[in-house]
Amino acid sequence: MEIGLREWLILIGIIVIAGILFDGWRRMRGGKGKLKFRLDRSYANAPDDEGGAEVLGPSRVLETHKEPELDESDLPSVSAPARERERDPKPAKASKRGKRNHSEPQQGDLNLAAEAREPDLFADDKDDFVADNNRHGAAATPSTPVKELPPAEEVLVISVISRDEGGFKGPALLQNILESGLRFGEMDIFHRHESMAGHGEVLFSMANAVKPGVFDLDDIDHFSTRAVSFFLGLPGPRHPKQAFDVMVAAARKLAHELDGELKDDQRSVLTAQTIEHYRQRIVEFERRALTQKR
């Protein structure tokens, strides 16, 4: 059978069309492979762990939500909580009689038992402490009337701001600070005493950094706050440097376990240099106090 020109043209057209289709299919397949390769490389350059996402977390919160007010107007007066009790002459005499060994664990290896206090100083509130501790897990404050010391000359503040938009939830927050030895007390805020059980002088306190600055234990299950502030007033505890170390440990524990960010009294990120500067302020205050006594 003889093939004419028309048949040849049809055959050539079919071959050309098949070649075009094959070339297009080859290019599409090659493009898919190249796209997949690029996506894999892009993913490989992503942050290795969730730590990177946590670093970016605070920026998103600060851009979309106003940072909680942490100035002194939002905090309760530190003249009373930082120094709830003035030591009577009796404890001084008791300290000469001997030393008392504490059986309760002391956070941050704090040992303030060198100077014993009058054993009966907290006897009046023993029953209240037991009852309130069974109900809330927090110690009640002594009911004995006390004389307040002069207002604080120095206040060391460490704030913990939640990275979560929902803030710190009441039950988790309460559990965390109870583990650090803080107990609910006067002014409806938490205080850290020498003893983990809530006895002894107040070392430092923790307030709600958002107005009105207090906590409601009766509604703690529905409570939440964007930030809390730990503060230590000077003059205050007899051993301010050790008390400050305990406060730093409690703030770090809260920030680590509840995903918070540490801030100083200027609302800047708390650094090792800032902590050292706080310690230097304590040293300078003690030096001035000694000079005034002379």
From Swiss-Prot:
Membrane topology qualifier: Single-pass type I membrane protein
Amino acid composition bias (Basic and acidic residues), ranges on this chain: 82-91
Location relative to the cell: Cell inner membrane
Cytoplasmic side stretches: 23-294
GO BP term, pick one: division septum assembly
Keyword entries, A-Z: Cell cycle, Cell division, Cell inner membrane, Cell membrane, Membrane, Transmembrane, Transmembrane helix
Sequence intervals crossing the membrane: 2-22
Stored SMART domains: ZipA_C
Stretches for region Disordered: 64-111, 126-146
GO CC annotation terms, alphabetical: cell division site; plasma membrane
Pfam families reported for this sequence: ZipA_C
InterPro entries in the record: Cell_div_ZipA, ZipA_FtsZ-bd_C, ZipA_FtsZ-bd_C_sf
Periplasmic side: 1
Family: Belongs to the ZipA family.
Subunit structure: Interacts with FtsZ via their C-terminal domains.
Function: Essential cell division protein that stabilizes the FtsZ protofilaments by cross-linking them and that serves as a cytoplasmic membrane anchor for the Z ring. Also required for the recruitment to the septal ring of downstream cell division proteins.
HAMAP family in the record: ZipA
Full protein name: Cell division protein ZipA
Organism: Pseudomonas entomophila (strain L48)
Source species taxonomy: Bacteria, Pseudomonadati, Pseudomonadota, Gammaproteobacteria, Pseudomonadales
